[in-house]
Amino acid sequence: MFDLKQTLLLISELMHLFLLRLQNTSVMDPQTADRSPKITLIKVSNGPLTGSRKRPSEGNYEKEKDVCIQLFDQWSEADQVEFVEHLISRMCHYQHGHINSYLKPMLQRDFITALPAQGLDHIAENILSFLDARSLCSAELVCKEWQRVISEGMLWKKLIERMVRTDPLWKGLSERHQWEKYLFKNRTTEVPPNSYYRSLYPKIIQDIETIEANWRCGRHNLQRIQCRSENSKGVYCLQYDDEKIISGLRDNSIKIWDKQTLECLKILTGHTGSVLCLQYDERVIVTGSSDSTVRVWDVNSGEVLNTLIHHNEAVLHLRFCNGLMVTCSKDRSIAVWDMASPTDISLRRVLVGHRAAVNVVDFDDKYIVSASGDRTIKVWSTSTCEFVRTLNGHKRGIACLQYRDRLVVSGSSDNTIRLWDIECGACLRVLEGHEELVRCIRFDNKRIVSGAYDGKIKVWDLQAALDPRAPASTLCLRTLVEHSGRVFRLQFDEFQIISSSHDDTILIWDFLNVSTNGQTEGRSPSRTYTYISR
């Protein structure tokens, strides 16, 4: 085996050959030519042809090497690389091994340690900030310098902040556990040390795993609001945030509840028929009623700001966003409105085409989607209000629908739920399990939650439902049974479901703050009741 010095000697000899060729093309001194070494070619096993000659004296070798280096330095980088590649291609595999051993430490440098030495700590921190939790744990064990960069760069804090920005579950936990006050602060403000965030991360992971297990197993804490309607009983619609729940009732009223205490804060009256649908934002509440009107209320004062009279029969559903509102009615029509302000709302277009009551609408910047008792879902262009396509498949009227991105999920009085690709109109999956009309449905990135006239709420695995290979028996994760009447409306997030029913109650199913009670046969497991009557 050649050692490294022998390999370098061989390279210099090949360079000498190259010089000889250069000299052969020019006028040469006869005496110099006579002293040229005699070269013979030998074949090395498993390698290319290599030159073999008697080693020149040290003096000649040094001179020849210096000449080669001078010529090499005069070439461009591309020519240098090409020349070295040519030399390497003429070597044997064991010579390649020697060169690899020589180059390896040059190529595998600890740049994380080297950067701070050059005053570039921020670059080292930025590089390591892209690591996930497992890789960050490993990086801490590399050496003390890496551990110092991670600690002083507060990289565990940055990792948690990145998760909070991109994952709704992390964001919700940060708000509920109040450790968001330690996030998104610069280094000049007083923040805990890196060790605080290092220990916080596994606690968050444990919380997330517990919440996911609670959803799968149906473990929840249950709170119940008894609405105590005076005349007609039933809660037709609701929406909630962290502070309040706003509900529309069969007795024509709108009730606003404190989310924490479950106390009724305010009752809005004005409709002369049942409040069938509602939506609110930070400024207004918009409601639709069986009295055929749409009313706009100030969300803080409860004052009526506007009343829209257009539909000839009950307003069954409405949605508004970014200055656009869409309403639908038992009169079979869909109305598209421009909302310049709460008091300046004008009718843009009326969409007709359904042959029965239009029960639900949803929209985004691309499509308006409507579903009807005529068993069809129709798709319209949001910008032009022109008809695009019809989705056919349900065997009876469609009662509920949600649309987001390319996915439409609908529920019908044929007791099924269907998933659709809105772009091609294909039905992707049929979910079966409810025993009566599916009245309300919502989905997020993980789950579909449905409520039906059978009084049951079902939680479905969305990703499995979108996988055609998944068996139908694996799709329904849990059935929740607490309502004693038809489920009219529900909304959910990562931590809870809030539902309303014909039984005049609003139920809050909390999957975050769960007691340790055991399961009860035939009912939803792990329930703790809070009864509020107002």
Curated annotation (Swiss-Prot):
SMART domains: Beta-TrCP_D, FBOX, WD40. Disruption phenotype: Knockdown of both fbxw11a and fbxw11b results in abnormally developed pectoral fins and heart edema by day 3 post-fertilization (3 dpf). At 5 dpf, knocked-down embryos show periocular edema, small and misshapen eyes, and abnormal development of the jaw. The keyword ATP-binding does not apply. It comes from the Eukaryota. GO terms for cellular component: cytoplasm; nucleus. WD repeats lie at residues 228-267, 268-307, 308-347, 351-390, 391-430, 431-463, 480-510. Residues 59-108 are annotated as: Homodimerization domain D. One of its GO terms (biological process) is protein ubiquitination. Pathway: Protein modification; protein ubiquitination. Residues 121-159 form the F-box domain. InterPro entries: Beta-TrCP_D (IPR021977), F-box-like_dom_sf (IPR036047), F-box_dom (IPR001810), G-protein_beta_WD-40_rep (IPR020472), WD-F-box_domain-protein (IPR050995), WD40/YVTN_repeat-like_dom_sf (IPR015943), WD40_repeat_CS (IPR019775), WD40_repeat_dom_sf (IPR036322). GO terms for molecular function: protein dimerization activity. Gene3D superfamilies: 1.20.1280.50, 6.10.250.1840, YVTN repeat-like/Quinoprotein amine dehydrogenase (2.130.10.10). It is found in: Cytoplasm; Nucleus. Pfam families: Beta-TrCP_D, F-box-like, WD40. Keywords: Cytoplasm, Nucleus, Repeat, Ubl conjugation pathway, WD repeat, Wnt signaling pathway. Its main location: cytoplasm. Self-associates. Component of the SCF(FBXW11) complex. The N-terminal D domain mediates homodimerization. Substrate recognition component of a SCF (SKP1-CUL1-F-box protein) E3 ubiquitin-protein ligase complex which mediates the ubiquitination and subsequent proteasomal degradation of target proteins. Probably recognizes and binds to phosphorylated target proteins: the interaction with substrates requires the phosphorylation of the two serine residues in the substrates' destruction motif D-S-G-X(2,3,4)-S. SCF(FBXW11) mediates the ubiquitination of phosphorylated CTNNB1 and participates in Wnt signaling regulation. This is F-box and WD repeat domain-containing 11-B. The gene is fbxw11b.
